[in-house]
Amino acid sequence: MPTPFAPLKNDTFLRALLRQPTDYTPMWMMRQAGRYLPEYRATRTRAGSFLGLAKNPDYATEVTLQPLDRYDLDAAILFSDILTVPDAMGLGLYFVDGEGPKFERPLRDEKAVQALKVPELDSLQYVFDAVTQIRTELKGRVPLIGFSGSPWTLACYMVEGGGSDDFRTVKAMLYNRPDLMHHILQTNAITVAAYLNAQIDAGAQAVMMFDTWGGALADGIYQQFSLHYMREVMKHVKTEKEGVRIPSIVFTKGGGLWLNEIADVGADAVGLDWTVNLGAARAQVGDRVALQGNLDPSILFAQPEQIRTEVEKVLMSFGKHAPGSGHVFNLGHGISQFTPPESVSVLVDAVHELSRSLHA
């Protein structure tokens, strides 16, 4: 029995992803529910830990909605972590203050890799419960985005056992034992597709795949070990539910050189970091995909008038909208935890105000 969610009042974000006409350029921010907000920090304290926050649907709902109560954003994104997936695979996720995520049982040898299996999604029910609860609490204000890490980005953490400056362990496996790396990536691809589909079933109205570390790979290697598996995911992710289109976004940080290939991965939109010229990107992809991005998050430490100037540059770089074009304004990566919350108000208002003339 379908859950009777409220009708959507603001579908601007979804329309932009599908390259349909909009009155203005919609916007949201990667990590918009996060540590830069005092209300997030208060909820995080109540939850007791990051995992206490992410694994509790009530807390996850609360923090997902916090930026929407403060700013006129055009989408909500599920509050979760990409590493919930390898955690469900039995790698033992934990967090160390000041060091970030770690795994108790990283994939360091053939035995560990061969034992890796696609997990039962029941162990991620807390994520799907959060999706349904958030969608219900949104009451149709804006669409809800579900997400996952890409197969390669998840593999980086699974092999390294945490974050890394140089990815030497995972790259050594990639070059020395490509068979083991392909086994990990194939397992991840099957899991990520199922995970995104379960989020769609739970109420997500769009989905995004974060390939945060794709840009760490060499040309040629990226295509084999990251792009190929994102394409595998996209082949199996639902594009509609109950007759309604579910748009998808892929984002490789540092992937500007491969934009032409990423545009053919099977997603509706491609995210860009701040190193890419948006106008040149639009010319390159044509009307194959919408684009998302790509303001440097550090601009939010500047004065309000400078923020408005840089917003206008991004909007003008994309240019006037035409049939078949689509742009979702976003940062080129996640918002910094040190960002002044009032800078985000300036950003959101500037995007909405300055973009209207480009949609006339």
Swiss-Prot record:
PROSITE patterns: UROD_1, UROD_2. One of its GO terms (biological process) is protoporphyrinogen IX biosynthetic process from glutamate. It catalyses: uroporphyrinogen III + 4 H(+) = coproporphyrinogen III + 4 CO2. Keywords: Cytoplasm, Decarboxylase, Lyase, Porphyrin biosynthesis. Coiled coil: none annotated. Substrate binds at R31, Q32, A33, G34, R35, D81, Y157, T212, H333. It is found in: Cytoplasm. One of its GO terms (molecular function) is uroporphyrinogen decarboxylase activity. Gene3D superfamilies: 3.20.20.210. CDD domains: URO-D. One of its GO terms (cellular component) is cytosol. The record marks D81 as: Transition state stabilizer. Belongs to the uroporphyrinogen decarboxylase family. NCBIfam families: hemE. HAMAP family: URO_D (MF_00218). Homodimer. This is Uroporphyrinogen decarboxylase. It comes from Herminiimonas arsenicoxydans.
